[in-house]
């Protein structure tokens, strides 16, 4: 495609500069003119042939660089250049080459001794550069003029044929490439960063955020949590593997958990039902309790007075605490909180340890037993000595 670049250079120029040896070229557009007629006078503005008073139209081929004040006559009706159809760059080049072959039979052009042989197809870029040098003189002689479509932002040369507009500039298709891998972008989607173009693969690999789970680039939706980025499908509970729903997640030791697993694994457990304590709770016996679970271990009544008794890590009301410890009075059935008397495998309040017959308090714990009852010595003798 470098041939098209050369085309643009002279398509852009309306006149060409040449060396002194081409100061008097043979024009392919002036037929039947003698050598004397080809000389350009300095004062007249038109050229006329002998025997013909009407002025001849002169086609401007190119301007020269001669230091002498010789000037070509003005072109009255310049001949339009035959432009190739704007179908494709390859079609334009083919038509141009055919036109050159036809004109070479009429125009005498000095051979270019510096012309190099074309390399093979494997070195096609070097071949195009060589063709540019070969075609430059022929294009100047033909006077082909074309309006370029712009200048390539990469090579700074005119663009003919296909053109790509991107990043606010124009490019040859073969020059609009990925900054990293140098692959042609063409009409493929690309990404811009700092004024440079990247293909999708390289852009995501170089600049896209990485998933904290799989470490792959995130090319679509990105989820940000725990100061990291994630693929939405890779942000899930560390215990059960379920993707988090609307209820969100809980974090523990830099790992995300769903609410169910977090509470089951890390929230404090109720000392009564062993389920997680979520809201209101009571703290007692170095653990937490649901209010409805903090009750007597035997009668399951709540502690309305605010006091309880602990036995074997469980709370009890006063009555059942003493019952389990065997400190209920055998006579009245009430807890014994002070002094007590132990007799017949039971405990008694001192005031309740009395004779079963006369109901007098047995002094100093001296008593007689009959049928699991206590008697004072006097009543026992009276009732059972006969």
Curated annotation (Swiss-Prot):
Residues modified to N-acetylmethionine: 1
Complexes and interactors: Interacts with unphosphorylated ITGA4. Interacts with AR and SRF. Interacts with PTK2B/PYK2, PTPN22 and PTPN12. Interacts (via LD motif 3) with LYN and the interaction is induced upon B-cell antigen receptor (BCR) activation. Interacts (via LD motif 3) with PTK2/FAK.
Protein family: Belongs to the paxillin family.
Subcellular location: Cytoplasm; Cell junction, Focal adhesion; Nucleus; Cytoplasm, Perinuclear region
Region Disordered, annotated ranges: 19-52
InterPro entries per record: Tgfb1i1/Leupaxin/TGFB1I1 (IPR017305), Znf_LIM (IPR001781)
Motif placement: LD motif 3: 92-103
Keyword Hydrolase attached: no
Cellular component terms (Gene Ontology): cell projection; cytosol; focal adhesion; nuclear speck; nucleus; perinuclear region of cytoplasm; plasma membrane; podosome
Biased composition (Polar residues): 22-52
Name of the protein described by the UniProt record: Leupaxin
Domain LIM zinc-binding: 150-208, 209-267, 268-326, 327-386
């Amino acid at each position: 495609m470098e041939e098209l670049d050369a085309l643009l250079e002279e398509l852009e120029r309306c006149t060409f500069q040449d060396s002194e040896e081409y100061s008097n070229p043979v024009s392919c557009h002036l037929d039947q003119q003698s050598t004397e007629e080809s000389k350009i006078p300095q004062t007249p503005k038109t050229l006329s042939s002998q025997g013909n008073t009407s002025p001849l139209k002169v086609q401007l081929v190119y301007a020269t660089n001669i230091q002498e004040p010789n000037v070509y006559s003005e072109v009255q009706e310049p001949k339009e250049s035959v432009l190739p159809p704007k179908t494709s760059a390859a079609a334009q080049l083919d038509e141009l080459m055919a036109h050159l072959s036809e004109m070479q039979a009429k125009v005498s052009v000095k051979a270019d001794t510096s012309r190099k042989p074309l390399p093979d197809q494997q070195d096609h870029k070097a071949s195009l550069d060589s063709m540019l040098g070969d075609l430059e003189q022929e294009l100047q002689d033909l006077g082909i003029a074309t309006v370029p479509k712009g200048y390539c932002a990469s090579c700074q040369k005119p663009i003919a044929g296909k053109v790509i507009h991107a990043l606010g500039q124009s490019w040859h298709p073969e020059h609009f490439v990925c900054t990293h891998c140098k692959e042609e972008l063409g009409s493929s989607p690309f990404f811009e960063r700092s004024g440079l173009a990247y293909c999708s693969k390289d852009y995501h690999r170089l600049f896209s955020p990485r998933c904290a789970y799989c470490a792959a680039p995130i090319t679509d939706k990105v989820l940000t949590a725990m100061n990291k980025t994630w693929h939405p499908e890779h942000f899930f509970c560390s215990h059960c593997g379920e993707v988090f729903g609307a209820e969100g997640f809980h974090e523990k030791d830099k790992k995300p958990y769903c609410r169910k697993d977090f509470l089951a694994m890390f929230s404090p457990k109720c000392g009564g039902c062993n389920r997680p304590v979520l809201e209101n709770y009571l703290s007692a016996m170095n653990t937490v309790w649901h209010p409805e679970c903090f009750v007597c271990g035997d009668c399951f009544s709540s502690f309305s007075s605010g006091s309880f008794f602990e036995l074997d890590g469980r709370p009890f009301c006063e009555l059942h605490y003493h019952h389990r410890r065997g400190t209920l009075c055998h006579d009245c059935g009430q807890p014994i909180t002070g002094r007590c008397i132990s007799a017949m495998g039971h405990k008694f309040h001192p005031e309740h340890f009395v004779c079963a017959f006369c109901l007098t308090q047995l002094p100093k714990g001296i008593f007689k037993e009959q049928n699991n009852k206590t008697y004072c010595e006097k009543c026992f003798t009276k009732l059972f000595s006969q």
